């Protein structure tokens, strides 16, 4: 009778392990989907941010370069007008003498701006080449076809997890079942030993006197 009870107890244990393994499988697939999607979205957002910063720096460089050209053109116009006014007031000793004011002199610092913009363009070019060299084939494929790479990265993780479970799941399940069987056998032996000691401790004379 005890062996039958032990046999009935093993079936729910195996069923529980199967359900547990199935739950771990589904949980692993869900976790793989979530992890792959999150990593892909984070990488895409980082690349978009980097590209946006690169474009903004290019626009700033172009704007400052245009301002430098405009300032250079304006200074040429001002100097040309100054020379013309000096010729008109040549008899009075020039424009400053006619106005009886100190003469203003033009200090050209556009060369520093021009050099800074040239260095900025060079750094932007180097950064763009470095970014393209570090970009892998998967990222290049993502830039060409985002939906396809999203599908691949989403499915790849769960497929790998499912393949690992199919390869190692039966072995692990058999080990767990064997371990539980061994534990049940030990418990069964302990129970039988305890019952044997209880029967052995009973005095036969007391049993006969009761009868």
From Swiss-Prot:
Superkingdom: Viruses
Reported function: The surface protein (SU) attaches the virus to the host cell by binding to its receptor. This interaction triggers the refolding of the transmembrane protein (TM) and is thought to activate its fusogenic potential by unmasking its fusion peptide. Fusion occurs at the host cell plasma membrane. The transmembrane protein (TM) acts as a class I viral fusion protein. Under the current model, the protein has at least 3 conformational states: pre-fusion native state, pre-hairpin intermediate state, and post-fusion hairpin state. During viral and target cell membrane fusion, the coiled coil regions (heptad repeats) assume a trimer-of-hairpins structure, positioning the fusion peptide in close proximity to the C-terminal region of the ectodomain. The formation of this structure appears to drive apposition and subsequent fusion of viral and target cell membranes.
Domain characteristics, as noted in the entry: The YXXL motif is involved in determining the exact site of viral release at the surface of infected mononuclear cells and promotes endocytosis. The 17 amino acids long immunosuppressive region is present in many retroviral envelope proteins. Synthetic peptides derived from this relatively conserved sequence inhibit immune function in vitro and in vivo.
Organism: FBJ murine osteosarcoma virus (FBJ-MSV)
Ranges annotated as spanning the membrane: 152-172
Residue ranges annotated as Extracellular topological domain: 1-151
UniProt site (Cleavage): 10-11, 190-191
Gene symbol of the encoding locus: env
Name of the protein this chain belongs to: Envelope glycoprotein
Record GO biological process: fusion of virus membrane with host plasma membrane; symbiont entry into host cell; virion attachment to host cell
Motif YXXL motif boundaries: 196-199
CDD domains linked to this entry: HTLV-1-like_HR1-HR2
Region spans: Immunosuppression: 79-95
Keyword list, A-Z: Cleavage on pair of basic residues, Coiled coil, Disulfide bond, Fusion of virus membrane with host cell membrane, Fusion of virus membrane with host membrane, Glycoprotein, Host cell membrane, Host membrane, Host-virus interaction, Lipoprotein, Membrane, Palmitate, Transmembrane, Transmembrane helix, Viral attachment to host cell, Viral envelope protein, Viral penetration into host cytoplasm, Virion, Virus entry into host cell
SUPFAM superfamilies per record: Virus ectodomain
Lineage, highest ranks first: Viruses, Riboviria, Pararnavirae, Artverviricota, Revtraviricetes
């Amino acid at each position: 009778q005890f062996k039958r009870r032990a046999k009935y107890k093993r079936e729910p244990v195996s069923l529980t392990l199967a359900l547990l393994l199935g739950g771990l499988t589904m949980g692993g697939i869900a976790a793989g989907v979530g992890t792959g999607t999150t990593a892909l979205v984070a990488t895409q957002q980082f690349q978009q941010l980097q590209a946006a910063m690169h474009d903004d720096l290019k626009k700033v460089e172009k704007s400052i370069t245009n301002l430098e050209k405009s300032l250079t053109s304006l200074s040429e116009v001002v100097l040309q007008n100054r020379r013309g006014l000096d010729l008109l007031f040549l008899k009075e000793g020039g424009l400053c003498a006619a106005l009886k004011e100190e003469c203003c002199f033009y200090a050209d610092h556009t060369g520093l701006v021009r050099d800074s913009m040239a260095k900025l363009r060079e750094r932007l070019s180097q950064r763009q080449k470095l970014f393209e060299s570090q970009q892998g084939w998967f990222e290049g494929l993502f830039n060409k076809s985002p939906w396809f790479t999203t599908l691949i990265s989403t499915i790849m993780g769960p497929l790998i997890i499912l393949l690992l479970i199919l390869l190692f799941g039966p072995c692990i399940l058999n080990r767990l079942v064997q371990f539980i069987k061994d534990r049940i056998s030990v418990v069964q032996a302990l129970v039988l030993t305890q019952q044997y000691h209880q029967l052995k401790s009973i005095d036969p004379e007391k049993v006969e006197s009761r009868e």
